[in-house]
């Protein structure tokens, strides 16, 4: 989203004070979506740090067991730093934005998670809230803002149904240290995760499907968007991560038709200063192991960012489907636009049409490096002359990746982002076959020349294995014999 947007209205403030969830379950949702497999061992009954919540919970209960859950309001306002709120399976009707009531601390995060007995379906059902396009209320489903709980929070295993009316599923505005893990987002106006001037974010193993169709500026974003990243501190290591997510059917139906991508690092027009200095400091970001197909916009883009960033082991298949508008007609899949200091390593990018480059560089970019990528479906493109920088470049394999059962897209039909096959039907469709040219062609991206030492060390940290050293499904990378495959799946 190419603008800073933070709208807090009195109607939303009322939700902060009374809670945005109805006390009874809403009617059944219409689309069967997957839910994350949740480790319930952390939801131990009768623990002093665990609270249970349910759509029909009662604050007269003690909230200490699955049989005695509190309401969402009661449990979330009772939890303290270091506590965990475990949500029982069910459907939760959300009538307005949920603002976490308090922050955790660096050593004691607050965790919101599905208990694991069934999907936790959060369904946007506002009654009087004036959401776009009719109004300008903050219609984000969960929003971390400085006026309430905004840091050291984790959200895990929820399914959000935006009904085409909610803004973003998760919002972050001038906040820091947030984790969004294993969530599913369907049919919001904006992003699955939409962050503006935030830092230390992790978005991992989420699904964002069929969002951005509202026709308002709320749609001027992408599946997961980190906008104007603002440094919380001057640590030289890895700050922000987008990993192991699936984005499908994203669409920018705003008047601009410039976004609708799977993932974006978007604008650092206001770089932060290191504490005690006037020098701008821009924290490092990683986009890895993601899958994007059937989107109206790009697979992933770095737009006007100049901090160190890397896109590694992503699988991009048939994106750029919103070709009606001039802003999208010839854009690339893995794209830089007025960006600097970026690495592309071990990616697979397959174009829909030859006019949509698998990789492109728009406007003036500097220090963009490529290592062991596959490009297929069309020539690459660099401004101003449109030359194919992938041709005759040993860092690119120009071949069909030979996927097992890739989703079908018509080679010319418009609007195919809307009916793109949902991710729970994908199965192993974008895993390479044994004859694929991507087997054993990759490199360990942490060892590439010029990667900042502390960033490499953070990516190599065993606690961060899912970012680099495990594939999308958790298989160890490298595989047998030191084999490192391209794309999100290791054979």
Segments from the language model and where they lie:
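C-terminal accessory segments
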Residues: 394-491
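Enriched but not universal
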Residues: 1-41, 490
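Extracellular beta-strand/beta-solenoid scaffold signature
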Residues: 95-100, 126-145, 164-172, 187-196, ...
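Acidic Gly/Asp/Thr-rich repetitive segments characteristic of extracellular carbohydrate-active
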Residues: 44-45, 53-99, 436, 473, ...
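Feature marks extracellular polysaccharide-active and adherence modules
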Residues: 88, 113-115, 156, 161, ...
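Predominantly extracellular beta-rich ligand-binding scaffolds that present long acidic/polar faces
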Residues: 95-101, 107, 247, 275, ...
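All-beta strand scaffolds that present successive hydrophobic residues in beta-strands
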Residues: 87, 112, 150-155, 178-180, ...
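Right-handed parallel beta-helix/beta-spiral solenoid domain characteristic of secreted/periplasmic
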Residues: 55, 86-95, 103-168, 398-401, ...
